[in-house]
Amino acid sequence: MTIERTFSIIKPNAVAKNVIGAIIQRFESTGLTVVGAKMLQLTREQAEGFYAEHKGKPFFDSLVDFMISGPILVQVLEGEDAVRRNREIMGATNLANALAGTLRADYADSFTENAVHGSDSAESAAREIAYFFADGEVCTRIR
């Protein structure tokens, strides 16, 4: 197994529900470690830039509107197979397909308001981490 980093967002609906701690606890209880975190209020430009790959898709505008509707918590998670493990913890993007016990089954409100975002690959993780974190803002933790 490889130690890697992945990127995670706790989205506005989950922040509004005051479940940040519960979500972080799920990550940490499965061996992922938070090595970077920031609470942010995205601007429209930041949200559009982050989700640029979805520009032109039918859900793009509603996704951007949702992501700027309230604060978010962006974080870098580290651990063995962090990308895969985070995606398992989050559950399916579509709430209808999210298995019981996953973050989305527990906290999502809809397809768009699905509580969390996580990188889909190591390459995406590197790009997404760099979008929100400068050099020196992510720290390796002693285990």
Swiss-Prot record:
Which GO BP terms apply? CTP biosynthetic process; GTP biosynthetic process; UTP biosynthetic process
Per its UniProt entry, which superkingdom is the organism in?
A: Bacteria
Q: Give the main localization category.
A: cytoplasm
Q: Which Gene3D superfamilies match?
A: Nucleoside diphosphate kinase-like domain
The gene is: ndk
Indicate what this protein is called per its UniProt record.
Answer: Nucleoside diphosphate kinase
**Under which main EC class is this enzyme filed?**
transferase
Organism the protein comes from? Sodalis glossinidius (strain morsitans)
Q: What are the catalytic residues?
A: 117
Residue ranges annotated as coiled coil are none
What is the stated purpose of this protein? Major role in the synthesis of nucleoside triphosphates other than ATP. The ATP gamma phosphate is transferred to the NDP beta phosphate via a ping-pong mechanism, using a phosphorylated active-site intermediate.
Q: What residues bind ATP, as annotated?
A: 11, 59, 87, 93, 104, 114
Claim: Cytoplasm is one of the keywords in the record: yes
Give the protein family.
Belongs to the NDK family.
Q: Which UniProt keywords apply?
A: ATP-binding, Cytoplasm, Kinase, Magnesium, Metal-binding, Nucleotide metabolism, Nucleotide-binding, Phosphoprotein, Transferase
Name a GO molecular-function annotation.
Answer: ATP binding
Instruction: Write one Pfam family the protein is assigned to.
Output: NDK
